[in-house]
């Protein structure tokens, strides 16, 4: 199951603790990428946050991984389930 997770930090919440959490995100991501749980990691230009693509076995696993994130308590999350468009059957055009 793949999910696009967009996390954003409110500017009003930027503090020393938040900055430390953000700086820990790279180290947090490395083992997740090595294990294949995170398959893409992006910065959203003009935003305080990022977009990560997770590949997990269940909703519960995704929730557990998000809760382990250093920015979990400082961020707002949007989670979108993804479907692989290359494996979907193509419907013929309507006549």
Where are the predicted features?
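Conserved, structured core segments of small domains
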Residues: 1-95
């Amino acid at each position: 199951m793949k999910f696009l997770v967009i996390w954003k930090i409110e500017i009003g919440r930027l503090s020393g603790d938040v900055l430390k959490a953000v700086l820990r995100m790279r180290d947090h991501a490395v083992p997740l990428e090595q294990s294949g749980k995170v398959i893409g990691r992006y910065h959203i230009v003009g935003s305080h946050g990022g977009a990560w693509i997770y590949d997990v076995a269940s909703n519960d696993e995704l929730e557990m991984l998000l809760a382990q994130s250093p920015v979990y308590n400082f961020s707002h999350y949007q989670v979108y389930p993804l479907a692989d468009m290359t494996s979907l059957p193509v419907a013929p055009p309507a006549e």
